[in-house]
Amino acid sequence: MTENIKLHTDQRVTTMTIARPEKRNAITQDMYAAMADALEDYAQSDAVRAFVITGAEDYFTSGNDLQDFAKGTRSDGVPPVIRFLNAISTCPKPLIAAVNGPAIGVGVTMLLHCDLIIAADTATFSTPFVQLGLVPEAASSLLLPATVGMAVANDMLLANRVLDAAEALRF
């Protein structure tokens, strides 16, 4: 487990905190491996009834650490990001997101796979994939329109419209 992913269990609820505040909680491949392990364990555990995902300090997550991803992926099996996305999208138990600040890119994608999203007033939601020359991952181009409607999803995905917590509450 990387020191940037913190797990705490209390009264059958595990909280996973993305804890890399010096990089606005940008996620590395090692962090994805730790998050995949945690979700896979949760899916199999009878001791835990709910799983909360949150970010440390002022950010939920600023998305992928692009410098880390530019180094390439490991060659041993399924890449950690794919393991994580598979684990979050197929988890048979309740997933709760506690969004304490900006959720960017894959941070929004994560939310689309959660059963409940609780957002602080400081939360914002943005998907700068096109501006970065990337494609939305893990069915976010399907799930975002289903959640916020086609017009808002297109505005978010194609023009990087940022939703604040008050606006997101409408959806």
What are these regions (language model features)?
Residues 40, 47, 55-90, 103, ...:
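Glycine- (often His-adjacent) and acidic-residue-rich active-site loop
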Residues 1-56, 86:
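Conserved CoA-thioester-binding segment of acyl-CoA-metabolizing enzymes
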Residues 89-171:
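Crotonase-fold acyl-CoA enzyme core
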Residues 16, 20, 35, 53, ...:
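Terminal peptide-recognition signature
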Residues 26-29, 62, 71, 131, ...:
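Phosphate-coordinating loops and pocket residues in cytosolic domains that bind phosphorylated ligands
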Residues 10, 45, 56, 72, ...:
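Structured helix-beta-strand junction loops
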Residues 31-34, 80, 110:
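Hydrophobic alpha-helical membrane-association signature
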